[in-house]
């Protein structure tokens, strides 16, 4: 062992000895927990001393440092941190509920309000478009007014939008309500992860930020249950579905009236005493001097290094580490959407109908199964994030998602291969559209949104089938022919299908959807939000998260607005093969560019982006060393991820 390393070991051991002496003086009769803590430190010290005497390089120092780090990160975290995280994550719950509830509500709305494919896509994507705009604007809002004010505004928008949706009497009012809700979603989506990350201790940050995504998937699952429960109210069921979001929004609003601002934002704004008080409240019995000094010094150094001239986004783009972080953050959000997640969530009931599930209520309840899968496996992600790390979890998740998309596409290929042949071609009445009668198979007929499939059944075989125009006033019946009168044709054992073909392979779509969410939910669901809440320095955090959230919502709009038309032109299986291709490209991006941020302080992570972008995936290199100081109950000693001989 080098002389410098030996000196560092001795200094660290003296610090630990001082700590234990101080504990004994303050606590004459230590409890079991204190005794256990001292034993663990003594064990680490003895281990390190033996390694030192054996001349074991610098490994002893690293072992001692890691033991000390683990011990002092195990100080009790106050329950207040969890309360703050849960109330914050109600924004995620509303995000999930308002994006998930439309899946079931759309099946009732399109019948009651006679919505064509364009209006269905508008009601889904208008929320997403508004979210994109407000997410981009949310960066400035967070920077000027703070995280707390932004969350309060989002809660108010959720409440107002839900009230408008519940009272809507036409599709235009519905569109307005969806726009208002979208504004709330956008602000919440970029603010909540940042707020949770800034109030969380480093050893819990990944899990607490992932709780936000857990609440998003919980909101989607709850929305699917509400959809199923109110699907039996054919007339006004959708009003209850869309209006119930006001309840958690009101709870969050009043809860946040009593919750604090982010201490990091307060320090940035010069409100240091208030920041110290809040940070102390968040850390309980842990000392906050080093964390407070680290945040304060980091802000001062960043202001000197980057300067304050010009818009923050321009400063981010001109400063290489933040530019690289922005590329990684925006790339993760883009590939999350291009892998098709919100097509799956927004249109899950419609996809199940496309695969051959005939009954609306059955499709809605089956969609709730997929939402429950999403929720449960997001819980798995909460457990894995601090064990496996962000990088491995994200890569493995997207790899499985790619395979699941291929399986989903193959399910639709099977259904297309056994698509019933059209055997009866009626003559169109004078002046009526005859385009639908030109199709030869049910699958071709279903790809045309203006057509439906009219048929009889002989046991399990489709007979006397025809493709005829759908009634524009109601998709429950045809514009003309045998299926023109819904009441009449049902008494004659004639069946009408719109958006689906009779098939024995409808189960493959449900299997594909479940497999997709099993792989997507633990990693690609929460990790883009978790990583983005960590990788930017404080001066760029609001703007960086606003940009990445905006990218997420922009690609969300592109995917959700085009899904039905993409399925029409590329076929259903073609659309899912396309998403699988995008996911495969995302794998290359994650492998080359995503660094590991597990266990690092927010103020340390910037150094991960000091190197060239596509080498940052190899985060174990010796480049970009950093030194960390922690206070051990009044005594300072250094912790380094590198050999102590590297530290001057």
Swiss-Prot record:
It is found in: Cell membrane. One of its GO terms (biological process) is positive regulation of amyloid-beta formation. The modification Phosphoserine is found at residues 6, 47, 50, 640, 645. PROSITE patterns: MFS, SUGAR_TRANSPORT_1, SUGAR_TRANSPORT_2. Its main location: membrane. GO terms for cellular component: apical plasma membrane; astrocyte end-foot; cell body; cell periphery; cell projection; cytoplasm; growth cone; intracellular membrane-bounded organelle. Induction: Induced by hyperosmotic stress. PANTHER family: PROTON MYO-INOSITOL COTRANSPORTER. Belongs to the major facilitator superfamily. Sugar transporter (TC 2.A.1.1) family. This is Proton myo-inositol cotransporter. The lineage of its organism: Eukaryota, Metazoa, Chordata, Craniata, Vertebrata. The gene is SLC2A13.
């Amino acid at each position: 062992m080098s002389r410098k390393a030996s000196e560092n070991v001795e200094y660290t051991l003296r610090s630990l000895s001082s700590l234990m002496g101080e504990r004994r003086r303050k606590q004459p009769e230590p409890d079991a927990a204190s005794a256990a803590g001292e034993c663990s430190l003594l064990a680490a010290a003895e281990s390190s001393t033996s390694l030192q005497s054996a001349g074991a390089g610098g490994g002893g120092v690293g072992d001692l440092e890691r033991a000390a780090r683990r011990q002092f990160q195990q100080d009790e975290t106050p329950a207040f941190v969890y309360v703050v995280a849960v109330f914050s994550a109600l924004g995620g719950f509303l995000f999930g509920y308002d994006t998930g509830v439309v899946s079931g509500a759309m099946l009732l709305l399109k019948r009651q309000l006679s919505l064509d494919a364009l209006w269905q896509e508008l009601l889904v994507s208008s929320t997403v478009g508004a979210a994109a705009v407000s997410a981009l604007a949310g960066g400035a809002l967070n920077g000027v007014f703070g995280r707390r004010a932004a969350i309060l505004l989002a809660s108010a928008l959720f409440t107002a939008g839900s009230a408008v949706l519940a009272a809507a009497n036409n599709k235009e009012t519905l569109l307005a309500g969806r726009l208002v809700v979208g504004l709330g979603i956008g602000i919440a989506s970029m603010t909540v992860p940042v707020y949770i990350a800034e109030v969380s201790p480093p050893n819990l940050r990944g899990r607490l930020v992932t709780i936000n995504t857990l609440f998003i998937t919980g909101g989607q699952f709850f929305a699917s249950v509400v959809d199923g429960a109110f699907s039996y109210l054919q007339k006004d069921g959708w009003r209850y579905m869309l209006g119930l979001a006001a309840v958690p929004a009101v709870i969050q609003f009043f809860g946040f009236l009593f919750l604090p601002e982010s201490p990091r934002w307060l320090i940035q704004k010069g409100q240091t005493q208030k920041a110290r008080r809040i940070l102390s409240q968040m850390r309980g019995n842990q000392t906050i001097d080093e964390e407070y000094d680290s945040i304060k010094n980091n802000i001062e150094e960043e202001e000197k290094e980057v300067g304050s001239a010009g818009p923050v986004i321009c400063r981010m783009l001109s400063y290489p580490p933040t530019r690289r972080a922005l590329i990684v953050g925006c790339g993760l959000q883009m590939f999350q959407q291009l892998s098709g997640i919100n097509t799956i969530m927004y249109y899950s009931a419609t996809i199940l109908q496309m695969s051959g599930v005939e009954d609306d209520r059955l499709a809605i309840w089956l969609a709730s199964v997929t939402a429950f899968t999403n929720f449960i496996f997001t819980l798995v992600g909460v457990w894995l994030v601090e064990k496996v790390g962000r990088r491995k979890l994200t890569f493995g998740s997207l790899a499985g998602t790619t395979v699941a998309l291929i399986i989903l596409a193959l399910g639709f290929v099977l259904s297309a291969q056994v698509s019933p042949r059209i055997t009866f071609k009626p003559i169109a009445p004078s002046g009526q559209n005859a385009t639908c009668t030109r199709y030869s198979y049910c699958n071709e007929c279903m790809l045309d949104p203006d057509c439906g499939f009219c048929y009889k059944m002989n046991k399990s075989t489709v007979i006397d089938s025809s493709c005829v125009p759908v009634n524009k006033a109601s998709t429950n019946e045809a514009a003309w022919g045998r299926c023109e009168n819904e009441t009449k044709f049902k008494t004659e054992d004639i069946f009408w299908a719109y958006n689906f073909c009779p098939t024995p392979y409808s189960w493959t779509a449900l299997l594909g959807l479940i497999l997709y969410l099993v792989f997507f939910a633990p990693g690609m669901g929460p990790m883009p939000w978790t990583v983005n809440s960590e990788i930017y320095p404080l001066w760029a955090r609001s703007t960086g998260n606003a940009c990445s959230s905006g990218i997420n919502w922009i690609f969300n709009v592109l995917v959700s607005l085009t899904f039905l038309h993409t399925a029409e032109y590329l076929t259903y299986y073609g659309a899912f093969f396309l998403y699988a291709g995008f996911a495969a490209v995302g794998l290359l991006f994650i492998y080359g560019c995503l660094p590991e941020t597990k266990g690092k302080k927010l103020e340390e992570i910037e150094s991960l982006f000091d190197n060239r972008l596509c080498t940052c995936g190899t985060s174990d290199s010796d480049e970009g060393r950093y030194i960390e100081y922690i206070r051990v109950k009044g005594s300072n000693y250094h912790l380094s991820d590198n050999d102590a001989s590297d530290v001057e």
